[in-house]
Every structure is written in structure tokens, then in C-alpha cells.
Amino acid sequence: MADLLKNLYGDTFFKQYCTALTTVIPSFDEDAFDKAVHTDEWEAMELKQRMKHLTQVTDQILPIKYTDKVATIIDIIGALRSQGVGDQNFIYTFLTDIIPLHGLQDIETSISAIEKITSFTSFEFAGRLFFVHHPDRMMNQMKIWARNTNPHVRRYASEGCRPRLPWGLQLKQFVLDPNPIIPVLELMMEDDSEYVRKSVANNLNDISKDHPEVVINLIKKWKDVSKNTNWILKHGARTLLKSGHPEALSLFG
């Protein structure tokens, strides 16, 4: 699967990406960029290696000042959208990794960047370090994003703080104590987007692996509030149900 995905970074991608870079960066040299990307090692690189390499090469052609980097990335996304590139585009996830690379010391600019970029390509992996370095600020922002009109931003409010996000950096503080997450999730317990509800359920399932009592208490509080809420709770308790947790089984009959 990873082998197939890495091949997404082929001629069609580079034509599309270089067109956007040419539009946004007046000094962009396509030949030099092509040589920087397609090193002797490129063909042997796996998916994650190619993405990391694209992050590094792209970063080198962006402005030095962090706020200017962010503005340029957002303009690049705009240029890609003008070509018809749709949102939640996996192959451009490498752009998100530039933000924590330079933005951990400028949390407000980074928060603004996350909100603007996460609709185009998910920030769930690149955003993890911000929870390590700025946990309180990020969790306060998650409460704001949980009420956002954009479902992609609302989803990030849940997905971004999952304690055990697969393939992502584990947020150990939330593995130890998930209570800061609960008020965020409760704001989305009746969300009208299935995309958001799935993320809330997955977050609860993460929590249940270390703190089943937290999820059980939430089920007792929210069960039968609505059909959507019941789906979130049952899907969020799936590991408990599969393992035969007595109280989870009794709650869902």
C-alpha cells in the first residue's frame, strides 16, 4: 500500500505543484527544484521518506521569516485549489510539517496556520508537538475549534488531541490523564457531521484503553440524548465491548 502511495508523487503531482509554486513564488526555479527533489536516492525512498524530503526541499524555497513562510504556504494552497485540487488532499500533507519545524515558538501564528490549512490537508500528525509544548493553549483552542462552522476544523479539535493517534506521536500527558479532552469532545457529542462524529468516537476509544471508567461515565451522562450521540458512544466503546467489559455490555444491552 505504501509503495502505491509513494508513486502518487509522480509527474502529475509535480506538474501541479510546480505550477502552484511558479504562481506564488516569483523567484521559483523549476529546474533547480526538480534536481533538489529527484536525487539519486529518490527512487528508493518510501512514502514517509519522500514526504519528509519534500518538506525539506519546499522549506528551502520559502521565505526565512516564519510568518512569511506561513503566508506563502497558504498562498500555495490557494493556487492548488485554483487548479481544482480538492480539500483533505493526502499527498500535500508534507506542507503541514513545515509549521512545527519553525513555529513552536510562535504559537499564535501557528494556531492560525493550523485552522487555515487543516481543511486542505489534515494537521493531525504535524500538530502533535504543539500539544507537548503548549498543552493549555492548544486545549483552550480546541474548545473554540469544536464550535467552528467548518467540519474539518471541528474534526481537528478531536483528532488533534487523540492520546493514541495511530502513526502519530503519542500524547503521553493525555494517556495519563484524559480529563482535559472530555470538555472538548462534549461540545461535539451531537455534531451533525459524520466525519466529526467518527473522530470523537475514535478519541473515546483511545481513552477507553487506559481509562475505561472515564468513557463509562461519559456514556452514562450522554446515552440516549440523541441517535447520533448513541452512535458515538457505542463506537467509542468498541474496544470495551469487544473485550467483554461488564459495565459497557450492560449499558448497551
Annotate the PLM regions.
Residues 1-253:
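Surface-facing alpha-helical segments and adjacent helix-coil boundary elements at the starts of domains
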